[in-house]
Curated annotation (Swiss-Prot):
Pathway: Cofactor biosynthesis; tetrahydrofolate biosynthesis; 2-amino-4-hydroxy-6-hydroxymethyl-7,8-dihydropteridine diphosphate from 7,8-dihydroneopterin triphosphate: step 4/4. Catalyzes the transfer of pyrophosphate from adenosine triphosphate (ATP) to 6-hydroxymethyl-7,8-dihydropterin, an enzymatic step in folate biosynthesis pathway. Belongs to the HPPK family. GO terms for molecular function: 2-amino-4-hydroxy-6-hydroxymethyldihydropteridine diphosphokinase activity; ATP binding; kinase activity. Its EC number is 2.7.6.3. GO terms for biological process: folic acid biosynthetic process; tetrahydrofolate biosynthetic process. Keywords: ATP-binding, Folate biosynthesis, Kinase, Nucleotide-binding, Transferase. It comes from the Bacteria. PANTHER family: 2-AMINO-4-HYDROXY-6-HYDROXYMETHYLDIHYDROPTERIDINE PYROPHOSPHOKINASE. Pfam families: HPPK. It catalyses: 6-hydroxymethyl-7,8-dihydropterin + ATP = (7,8-dihydropterin-6-yl)methyl diphosphate + AMP + H(+). This is 2-amino-4-hydroxy-6-hydroxymethyldihydropteridine pyrophosphokinase. Signal peptide: none annotated.
């Protein structure tokens, strides 16, 4: 497992924390993925389509032998398994998994753009990511973002709490 990737996770339908835990556990259960770091969980106001419930957001670091496109397929599979529907752009969702960084690669295809194109504009992505990624920590502190609507919901307590949760 020679690739390191960072994934943002979000949920704003139903038991949001359970969906986040299940998503992290499903990532970790994949034979080609090991979750190595988890951020705290943040409660955030919706962005884009604002007529919806607040989100819980977090980020994870993984080690993987998957290539970026295989990882994208896995994240979409997990979203579908957890009941994600795509009816409204930026609308409510049970689970949202976005690949933020993959090694230090720049990828720009129709399917996948890495680094994630809007991550530096969104504190709900930067705050959890900066906790677990030194590469982003310095950039996050100087980024111009609206800090209102982003607050720590649950402090991190380690990977084990997430990867051993019931699915």
């Amino acid at each position: 497992m020679n690739n390191i990737a960072y994934i943002a996770l979000g949920s704003n339908i139903g038991d949001r924390e359970t969906y986040l835990r299940q998503a992290v556990a499903l990532l970790h259960q994949h034979a080609a993925v090991t979750v190595t770091k988890v951020s705290s969980i943040y409660e955030t106001d919706p962005v884009g389509y604002e007529d919806q419930a607040q989100f819980l957001n977090m980020a994870v670091e993984i080690k993987t032998s998957l290539n970026p496109f295989e990882l994208l397929e896995l994240t979409q599979q997990i979203e579908n398994e957890l009941g994600r529907t795509r009816e409204v752009r930026w609308g409510p969702r049970t689970a949202d998994l976005d690949i933020l960084l993959f090694n230090r690669e720049n990828i720009e295809t129709e399917q996948l753009i890495v680094p994630h194109p809007r991550m530096y504009e969104r504190l709900f992505v930067l705050a959890p990511l900066a906790e677990i990624c030194q590469q982003v920590e310095k950039e996050a502190t100087s980024a111009e973002t609206d800090q209102e609507g982003v607050r720590v919901w649950k402090q991190k307590s380690g990977v084990d709490e997430f990867v051993h949760s019931e699915s």
